[in-house]
Amino acid sequence: THRVSSMGAVPGLSRSELDNHADTCVLGCNALITHDYERPVLVSGFHAADRPKTLRTVGGVVGYQDPSSGQAIYLAINQAIYAPENEHNLLGVFQLRMNDVRVNDLPKFMSADPTDQTHAITISLDNDGSELTIPLSLEGVISYFPTFKPSIRDNESSEEGIHLFHLTYASPDWDPLCPDFANSEENMIKPNGHVVPRNW
């Protein structure tokens, strides 16, 4: 059973929010669905009164306007749960990080030395060190960035690595309950609680 936060629709708004409690990304009605993995999942919320329900596992794309260039960027979110009643999308931070996407959720005003990569999502574009940085905003304590539903034509004409980037991987199968995550973390901690150096 997957766990996601409950989220109501807010007319006229579309955005993608970071959700540290969601073990899998969730796409709402303002994402363009491009693939059905035919792998339904049982989803539960945080309230005991919420009945678990079966939802589809899909791949989808959201659009984002890069404020530094004004260009439209398309972000593929693979192996996500489709919840069409939701206006916004939820981004499971762990799932993004497993695709080597850097997520910094510390607000800039809380950082001792903020940079462009503070409170931002950063995607490495190639081996020359160039990056796409998506700055995050706050509503209350929720980190988010504005997104929109792209047209089929815009998605099909976008060139991967130039206008299209993947926030999560399409394969292997995403399993948020995989014990390897806990084992890998345990192997990085000494019995005294200190971190194990990488070259130890």
What kind of feature is each model-predicted range?
Residues C25, H35-P40, P52-W200:
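Aspartic protease core domain of the pepsin/retropepsin superfamily
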